[in-house]
Amino acid sequence: MDSSEVVKVKQASIPAPGSILSQPNTEQSPAIVLPFQFEATTFGTAETAAQVSLQTADPITKLTAPYRHAQIVECKAILTPTDLAVSNPLTVYLAWVPANSPATPTQILKLRVYGGQSFVLGGAISAAKTIEVPLNLDSVNRMLKDSVTYTDTPKLLAYSRAPTNPSKIPTASIQISGRIRLSKPMLIAN
């Protein structure tokens, strides 16, 4: 099997799209769609319990700073093992949820989060394949920035137990990647 193959896995979710303010009937300002990608967390050195809200993630807030409106066009979590994962495998649990969900990363482990999934990274069987888990945009509010603040924007939960033989450097990581539509530029000082 080719170890460079990407495994794409959909998450089960409840279709409950967020509502947004209605747009005025006047001419809209131009919009630009930009890509983004950042490392959300790493695994393999200790127990990891991460909650990453896209609305407040530093790389996203920097990207959206000069605009009044920001809306997710597409987004995915990318689980990437390193070569160290082959000899030191680990299990990662993850789920996309609305930011106002009371779910925690450790609850995915106990299968208490609908759509939560577990992935084995590394080892002899799964080797070092990259796994993509797309965000279902029909289960969260796409608007990250608007005239009001929304509480049901996307949040990624990720958990991994402390490894039996912890590595000094991470054996895997999660990147969040996607595209975001930015509109209505603000006047800002240089």
Swiss-Prot record:
The modification N-acetylmethionine is found at residue 1. Keywords: Acetylation, Capsid protein, T=3 icosahedral capsid protein, Virion. Pfam families: Tymo_coat. This is Capsid protein. One of its GO terms (cellular component) is T=3 icosahedral viral capsid. It is found in: Virion. Belongs to the tymoviruses capsid protein family. It comes from the Viruses. It comes from Belladonna mottle virus (BMDV). One of its GO terms (molecular function) is structural molecule activity. Self-assembles to form a T=3 icosahedral capsid composed of 180 copies of the capsid protein. The capsid encapsulates the single-stranded RNA genome.
